[in-house]
């Protein structure tokens, strides 16, 4: 069957099987990413940020959507300020865009320093990639599958350092539940025996700005100074040695920490 959109394909038995594994990885990763703003590029009907603790979350796609937290925009022209986004999820965006480099540059622009990007993509070096060789019509086979190695190179050129990730979906891309059940024995051993051949990869990268020093809040610095001052005030250096003093500065002769002879 030929699917006219990626969303329709993800509702097929094979697409649902793949999306279930991608969502499981996202549900594990996004709760540990904090910030103020998160965006999801594409597939607006699927809430891939459902487990995120970031309150302000929006989806972005070129198509209009009736839901409230949706922005209609092109991926290479995001309507967000520079360095304003803490988390960006890209579910299979780069395979279906004419200029993936331009999209990545735009994401790098809107990401804050230490912001995270989660890239989901089809692995060309897998059984999914093999099927694409003889099936190039419809979604997702008409897309340009980009290898994980190349994605990492593109990200690193922009200062986005890969931090973690995994591959999944080692079964052949069967379109029916019956054949999927027969091949599910391949999933548990996939990471061990053919880890690079997963049908999809899921990659987390962090935006690094070299030469940048993170500045703690002013109240934090003030509290640290007060603690250091209070600790230093309890002791004073005298000629015979280091002695304990009370809050008023009087020497406490009942306990010597160290005596210098």
What residue spans do the PLM features occupy?
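A short glycine-rich, Lys/Arg-flanked "PGG" loop and its adjoining helix->strand segment in the class I
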Residues: 101-116
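Class I SAM-dependent methyltransferase Rossmann-like catalytic core
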Residues: 1-31
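Class I SAM-dependent methyltransferase SAM/SAH-binding core
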Residues: 28-78
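A short acidic, Gly/Pro-enriched loop at the edge of an enzyme's catalytic core
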Residues: 76-88
């Amino acid at each position: 069957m030929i699917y006219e959109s990626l969303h329709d394909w993800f509702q097929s038995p094979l697409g649902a099987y793949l999306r279930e594994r991608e969502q499981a990885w996202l549900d594990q990763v996004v709760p540990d990413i904090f910030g103020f703003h998160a965006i999801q590029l594409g597939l607006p009907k699927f809430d891939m940020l459902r487990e995120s603790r970031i309150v302000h979350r929006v989806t972005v796609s070129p198509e209009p959507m009736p839901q409230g937290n949706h922005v209609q925009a092109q991926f290479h022209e995001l309507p967000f300020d520079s360095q304003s986004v803490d988390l960006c999820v890209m579910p299979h965006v780069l395979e279906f865009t004419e200029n993936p480099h331009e999209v990545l540059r735009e994401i790098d622009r809107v990401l804050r320093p230490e912001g995270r990007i989660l890239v989901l993509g089809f692995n060309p070096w897998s059984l999914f990639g093999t099927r694409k060789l003889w099936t190039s019509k419809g979604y997702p086979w008409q897309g340009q599958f980009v290898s994980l190695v190349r994605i990492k190179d593109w990200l690193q050129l922009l200062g986005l350092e890969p931090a973690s990730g995994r591959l999944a979906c080692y079964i052949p891309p069967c379109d029916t539940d019956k054949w999927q059940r027969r091949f599910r024995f391949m999933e548990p051993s996939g990471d061990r025996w053919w880890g690079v051949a997963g049908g999809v990869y899921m990659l987390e990268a962090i935006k690094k700005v070299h030469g940048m020093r993170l500045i703690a809040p002013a109240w934090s610095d003030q509290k640290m100074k007060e603690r250091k001052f209070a600790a230093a005030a309890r002791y004073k250096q005298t000629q015979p040695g280091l002695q304990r003093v009370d809050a008023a500065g009087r020497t406490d002769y009942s306990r010597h920490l160290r005596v210098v002879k």
